[in-house]
Amino acid sequence: MLNGLFFAALILYFIATVLELGGMVFKKEKVTRLAWWLFVAGALCNTVYLVARGIIAQRLPLSNQFEFATAFAWGVAVMLIGLQVKSRAEWMRAAAMPMAFLILSYAALQPREITELMPALKSAWFGLHIGSAVFSYAAFVLAGCGGLRWLLQEKKLPKAQLAQLDYLCYRLVALGFLLLTVVILAGAIWAEQAWSAFWTWDPKETWALITWILYAIYLHLRMRKKLSGKVMAWFVVIAVPVVLFTFVGVNTLLPGLHSYG
């Protein structure tokens, strides 16, 4: 049953993505409406899967690459649903739905066995540190989706709508940046308790810091209005691969203290 929920979410995300893109290209509103509700159903399966896995494991399901990727896809989906409810974010769906599907597809390639937490992970900081990372990464990915929409629709959307889109990307980055700050600070305190050192320049720590600095630069430039909306859109789009490398690439290519995942 547990695997069935996971693959139901994966299949629903895939079908929703195909229908959303097809409906957008051929301007079929009924198709995109169906795509949306299938995506919501996928997010529900994703949610139930994580809850069930957590109950079975008797811990938060965030301890390895598979669990984090599954939660990451869920974070993208849940935040997109929240944006849709609050801001009618149809413009972001065609980019965000494929991201949720691709992240969950990556999870499907990882070992799915439920294992006991390593002693170093049995900490009160576990949920705050990793849970904040889930939503931080999701916010950055959605900001990138918004930036991509800005670039693709620059000549078609009125200036007021482009400005609104730019502001939403800014708010998503600000949220992601705040959460990433929590990730780094909580991780430093946790590391001092587990390994007697606040900072070890572990590859994951280093790339998290690089990501933090990158988005700090974006926020500085955006608040000072130093660059155009187009440059800012390119910034958040190009920053997404850095986020994904911090998540996937570091664990795969650069072994360190975080290699347990």
Range-by-range predicted roles:
Residues 1-261:
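Polytopic transmembrane helical bundles with strong interfacial aromatic enrichment
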